A protein has these predicted regions:
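N-terminal acidic leader/helix
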Residues: 2-31
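Charged low-complexity stretches with an acidic bias
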Residues: 3, 7-10, 57-81
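Short amphipathic alpha-helical heptad-repeat segments
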Residues: 9-13, 35-44
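A structural signal for well-ordered alpha-helices, especially hydrophobic packing surfaces
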Residues: 18-25, 44-47, 51, 69, ...
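Short, charged, amphipathic alpha-helical segments
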Residues: 30-41, 59-68
């Protein structure tokens, strides 16, 4: 798989995590919260993988994805308190 596709995967996984966290925090359903946590973990894993392959040109994109993922992680943590 090309790096371009891997970067697209980062963005898709972050967006999926955002949606799942949104649904889970509205419903507070245990399974949805678990699924949202899994989606965050998958997005984080893909993001960390791509950081090792990134060039300076990729940094802005990765920083944006990191910020969005961190925000959604915080949203999920707050919902679970």
């Amino acid at each position: 798989m090309s790096n371009f596709n891997n970067f697209e995967q980062v963005e898709m996984k972050v967006k999926a995590a955002q949606k799942l966290v949104g649904y889970a925090t509205m419903s507070m359903d245990h399974q949805q919260l678990t699924d949202a946590t899994d989606a965050i973990n998958q997005a984080r894993s893909q993001l960390e993988k791509m950081k090792t392959l990134a060039t300076d040109l990729d940094e802005e994109f990765l920083v944006k994805q990191e910020e969005e993922l961190t925000q959604v992680e915080q949203q999920l943590r707050e919902a679970q308190i």
